[in-house]
Amino acid sequence: MALAVVGLCCWQITPASGAEQWPQQSDPLRIAEPGVPLSPPQSVPSEPLADGAHLFNSPEPSLHGPTPKTLAEFVDLAQRSHPKLRSARASIEAARGKAVQAKLYPNPVMAGLSPQIAGDQSQWSGTVAQDFVTAGKLRLAQQAALREVQQSEYMLIRARFDVLREVRQSYYALLVSQRRVQIYKLLLDISKRSYEIGSQLAQAGEGTRADVLFWSIERDRAEVRLLNASVYIETGRRQLATAIALPRADIGTLDADLFQKLPQFELKTLQEAVVQANAQPRAAEANIARAQWMLERAAVQPIPNINLMGGYQRQVGIPAMDQGLVQVMMTVPLFDRNQGNIRSARADIASSRADLRVIELELATQAAQAVATYRTSQRLVEWYEEYILPKARETVSLTQALYARGEVTFLSLLQAQRILTETELAFVEAQADRWNGAVTISDLLQLEEFPPDANAPAVIEAVQENGPIRPLPPP
């Protein structure tokens, strides 16, 4: 008895030379309704993504070397070491992989079988089957996946500015803490001088022991405040080190101008500029386009794919017979025409459009809140600098001189000193609010340069409609 053996070899499927290559930049989104024209995302400083493996093993900057002092140095360290950016870049690579996979053609299926293994009527056959995808389903699926790629690219841009916002906030918070230490040192010096004057007057019989004790308490309070301010300096340095993703980095005295002049912004123009410049609406538009492509993909799903099978069969016997096998199969969309998924895809488009509107409204609200904080703190800073602080400092100097000559009581000097303390601290807090507002506005506008200058969007001259406001003249 002659036996026939059908052997299956290991096949290596090699991509055709004309296979579609992955573009470095995804093509512009396709939106079927009027709206903001979409453009490719702006470039983000990063390492090449030719090989996805290095995304998870990129070396971190060394902690040794020059201690950063300027904001630009801290930003550079953060962009090279922050895990948020590495995660966002890896998400882009993952989305690109899904887009490549979406258009890969189904693999052929090979089979070998024998309905009857032994005997003079034994049969041996081998077949090859292939699914032929119709109606451009693979192309539509890849187009939807490409929108996810572009959405991930916009999210990388947003992640980068999130990191910049954290670094900028931590940087100027530490700068404010440095200024607080300087103020508390000044107040401690004032308290020590007041204590010395009170002690001398008590020894001369012009003061009392109670006066000396009061000034001793004020001196001790000023010293404790200085110690506490030093604690905030240390914690602020650790927060800044964490913001650049180098928690053990050594941070010294920062080199920046806390009193730098900043521009004013017009609210309506700023809100429009934020919606245009921010990456969140662009990512939402990418999601709308993805939903539209998914609707087209769902619409062609009922069109059946074709399954074609061909093969060879050998029947052993007398006489032996060679036969060819052919089979064509397809699904008949009689009951399931993908009605539910089509309905769901249409709802996803409506939901995505609503999400875009929600994002635009939230950004406009954030811009209004940031401008409110920024304008009020800016006005406070200007008034403290020009009018309030000079008066408070002059009051303390005059009161100290009068108290040394015994012309005023210690209560008057104490009150003047407290006014100066409250004024100096309020001035510092106004500076902190001013810089927080500037950081928030720059984050919403996604400004590369910080602090913002006169070339930033929505900047106006800081002039009131009826002229600048000034305090009332003294009576």
Name each model feature, range by range:
Residues 73-79, 207, 211-221, 246-308, ...:
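Amphipathic alpha-helical coiled-coil scaffold segments and their short linker/junction regions
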Residues 24, 31, 55-68, 108-144, ...:
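Small/polar, glycine/serine/threonine/aspartate-rich low-complexity segments that form flexible
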Residues 143-146, 209-218, 410-418:
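Short, charged, amphipathic alpha-helical segments
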Residues 82, 89, 96, 103, ...:
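Alpha-helical coiled-coil heptad-repeat register
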Residues 39, 46, 159-160, 224-246, ...:
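Short segments within alpha-helical structural elements
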Residues 3, 7-10, 14-42, 426-475:
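Acidic, low-complexity, intrinsically disordered peripheral segments
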Residues 76-86, 93-107, 126-144, 153-161, ...:
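A glycine-/polar-enriched beta->alpha junction
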Residues 158-275, 370-373, 377, 420, ...:
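Periplasmic alpha-helical coiled-coil/stalk elements that build and connect Gram-negative outer-membrane
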